[in-house]
């Protein structure tokens, strides 16, 4: 019996994260539709969880603030490091 794998596309996950970082209208479109556990790759899930929390708290989202958020959560290394 073969193992069932979840669909995965690293490039698509990275495009979503990139859009959330650079396009102001992206987070409102995905925040209520995507959950961190929908990302196959753990580092992408960690980054998205930080983005989602920051969006819900009304905080500014950019590469520096997300890096700081991941650091505050103790997840910076797991998300790809500094």
Predicted regions and their residues:
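Noncatalytic partner-interaction/assembly domains of nucleic-acid and motor enzyme complexes
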Residues: 1-82
């Amino acid at each position: 019996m073969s193992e069932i794998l979840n669909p995965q596309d690293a490039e698509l996950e990275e495009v979503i994260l990139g859009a959330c970082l650079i396009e102001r209208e992206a987070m409102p479109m995905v925040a209520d539709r995507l959950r961190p556990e929908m990302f196959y790759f753990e580092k992408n899930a960690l980054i998205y969880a930080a983005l989602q929390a920051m969006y819900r708290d009304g905080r500014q989202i950019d590469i520096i603030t997300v890096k700081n958020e991941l650091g505050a959560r103790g997840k910076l290394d797991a998300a790809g490091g500094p």
